Amino acid sequence: MVVMKKKRILIVSAIVLLFLTVASAVTVFSADGDTTTQPKVEKAGGVELKVKRFPISRYQANNEASDDLIKGAFVGLTNVTFSFAGNIVRVVDTGMDILYNLQPIDEFANSITNVSKTVYKTLKKNFGEALFIFTCAYVVYLFCVRGSVKEAMRRSILFICVMVIGGLWMSNAGYYMKVLNALSVEAQGKLLTAGNGLVGIVQDEGNFADSSAIEKGKEMEGTVAVMRNLYFDIALMKPFLIVNFDETSEKKINEEDTDKGGLNRIDKLLSYKLSEDGEKDKKDYIKETEIDDYKNESMTSGNVFNQLGESFIAVVASIVIGIPFLALAFFNFLLQVVALVIVFFVPFAFILAYVPQLAYSGFVTLGRLGSVYLLKAMLGVIVLFVYVTCFIVDKLIPPNGFGMYLLNVAVLASILWIGFHKRDAIIKFVTAGKVVSVDNNMMENMRQNIVQPAWEQAKKIGGVWGNGGGVFTDFTKHFGGRKDGSNADGVTGAPSGGGNSPSGTAMGYDNTHAISRTPQKETANGIANHNSRSLKRNPQTLSKEQEKQKQKEAFANAKENKQQSHLARLRKDGINSPMLKDALNEGNEDLSKRAPILQDKKDESARTDQKEYVEQLLKQPNNQQQTDDASLQHEEESTSNRAPVLQENEKDTERTDQKAYIYDEQNQNLETDQQQDFEVQKDDSVSNSEPVAQEKTAEIKRSDQKVMMNQPEPQLGFESPQSTKVENQPIANNERKIRPSEPAKVHSDGIRVDEKQAVAPAENKTVSREKQPSSQTIKRTEQSVNSFDQVSLNEIARRSSSKVEDRLRRDERTR
């Protein structure tokens, strides 16, 4: 009986097992059939990887109108966007997996040992003996010649340490590299354990709920798996749920599932293959189950355009979140590569350490290698920062809905980007300044050493091309005025600018810097006899290099003299007189009222035609005078169209910047005032004693007096364009003429003294010529200019300087 019972039990058990096996096979076949697949379960460090459950290509937008002609095209465009985002997610996830977990040091440890031994033995065989003899001789020199026993002993011990430590490292380089790498990985794991303790408070669903499943000893791998799940959820999973279910919570979506025994709603939608039959079955499932049973409006035909707009979120999120995550993995891998490169140079460093002056080279190289491993361990701090930051943002701003999801992504991306730019500050803060950089400021060094020099060189090349264009422009300016009035020698006639255009402007010369030069003084000899003469001048041209050289010299002289001026010294001492400033400001205002400044900047010594004209004019008798007012008016109109007539002297050939005549006001005020008073008296006496009828001849013979010709310059705004009619009359008592032998006196700020102006429109001058009984005398109408009293700027400066000195003395006495 007992035997029969045992047989029955065995038969029943066999039948039950057979039935269960068949049922399991049927279930598996029905679940993983021709059109669907089952989700894969793959773990890393004890954490399941969500990105491995289904292929990334199945994360698409699903809609019942996918076969429609127009709306189907929009569904296809939405899926193209999801495909682009999926490729980015695939790259970042693979990079995090490989670059974090790949250990090139462990792979090349044995090879490193063999290479180090071979290189060290080769160098030692060829150079070791000579370097050993040199070191021994140096120790003997220190001991015997210099008598430094302490230094000789130190060098000997250091040499022995180099030989011993170098030999030990070369024989076991691979083992030491593995040990250091393992220590850095262990340090990273321990640092991340602290983060897992904070994240361990999560008990419900979420990406951080799996942190408690991290296996011991695999903290780094498990933490990286959690971060991979986090990135996948933000970049691809959440946009997929929003587009297809209009919800971001997987728990809420699966609660409505009526088929509790099979796959949930999300897995069911992802389980369909992308084959023709799979797409047909998925479309039937969408119409019958999602739309009819679950009332899912997100997959209806009217939501096609909304799905297209929401799909772009996946692309943005995958890029802005993926860059910081991938950068951390890249730096972790880069540090290991740097360590391998340093190890390759260790044998050379220890051979050079045989030289006494380079005894520390081997130890320094090993120190750099140790710092790389320390930096690799400190990289765990950055990973912990990202890990904890993602957790905090996920808890404070849970992505429960489309708006909250967008806010979560924006805040997390901003924090990660700020942390990425401040990575060196984080490491420096944690290590108390011992480690100051994660990547040794690689990006900034690349910008300064590669990008910036290339940009500067490109700017120089662009500047050369720009200068070439400027030279062509100047060439066209110089020769643009040559039209119909050229003679056999190629000389132009009257300039096309008319009487109102100065010579420099009419010839096309650059007059940018002409305002800082001394005014061109024209002679009175050119006023006589113009009815039968017409002056033709050749255009005086200089090369571009000579013009630039003259400008540079003028600016250099002006700068040097300005620094040496008395006013500059007062300003350096901190003395600023309000009265002096007011006086200088008044001088600046009066500057525009003074003598017109010649536009043409060419060298006056080359204008020989004017010399010849003046000499011929002096030799001719004074018997050609004008006879009527009409001829005089005609001559004045023709004169305005001619080039200015100049008289050469020493000062004209040595024209420099106005600032070259700056001198010390305090030491020469009294002498200057006396000289000016004497000149005024002399001018008055001469002008009162000369007859009116002989004034023209006297002015021609007096080579020390010059009168500015009425050359209107409307472009600079000094005078209005009108012809001046001058009559012979004694000069007023308050008028002062400038001798050609005297340089124009200028204040230290470049302001010409009012008393030394050749012609100023605002001066108090009234010139007239009275009619003579002779038949050849021509009567000219009197022209008066608005006059007002002027005070010498030199006098104002002298008074201001004296007041400043008195004030300083009072301040010193009060102290």
UniProtKB/Swiss-Prot annotation:
GO terms for biological process: transmembrane transport. It is a multi-pass membrane protein. Keywords: Cell membrane, Membrane, Signal, Transmembrane, Transmembrane helix. Residues 513-543, 619-630, 665-678, 720-732, 773-793 have a biased composition (Polar residues). The chain crosses the membrane at residues 127-147, 157-177, 311-331, 333-353, 372-392, 401-421. The keyword Heme does not apply. GO terms for cellular component: plasma membrane. It is found in: Cell membrane. Residues 1-25 form the signal peptide. Residues 544-563, 599-614, 648-658, 696-705, 734-757, 796-815 have a biased composition (Basic and acidic residues). Residues 483-815 are annotated as: Disordered. CDD domains: TM_PBP2. The keyword Membrane applies. NCBIfam families: CD3337_EF1877. This is Uncharacterized membrane protein YddG. The lineage of its organism: Bacteria, Bacillati, Bacillota, Bacilli, Bacillales. The gene is yddG.
